[in-house]
Amino acid sequence: MVLLVEKPDGEEWELEVEKEYEEDLGIEFENGGLMDDYRSCSNKCMFCFIDQMPPGMRDTLYFKDDDSRLSFIQGNYVTLTNMSDHDIDRIIRYHLEPINISIQTMNPELRCKMLHNRFAGDALKKLQKLYDAGITMNGQIVLCKGVNER
């Protein structure tokens, strides 16, 4: 993998990184940088474990991340509902992979119902666009009895 890094003065460095598929990239960001403002989830999933947590825990446990940068860097799963077409194009352009996607169902109407997000069904078009571009994806589902088990 080759990373192109642009320094604040405009100088560009190409860094070659050799790693196994399952290994972390090994990149850490300083405070005040790229990863300060994580994107929070806009869904209200019927199965969300964060919504089911007891009160009184530390605040960081209640943060619902849905950030594609965390998927690529840390292996977090995203629903694609918080990603713009620009975000998808950037993943394709820079070939950022693998991206981990929380799918739940391929039925757009059922996906909207499960995620309580009227735009959740549109994310399947983004999934297809990533597939067509050859982006490696890992998928997961939360199986809800009587809802998405067929």
Predicted regions and their residues:
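Conserved Radical SAM active-site core
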Residues: 19-150
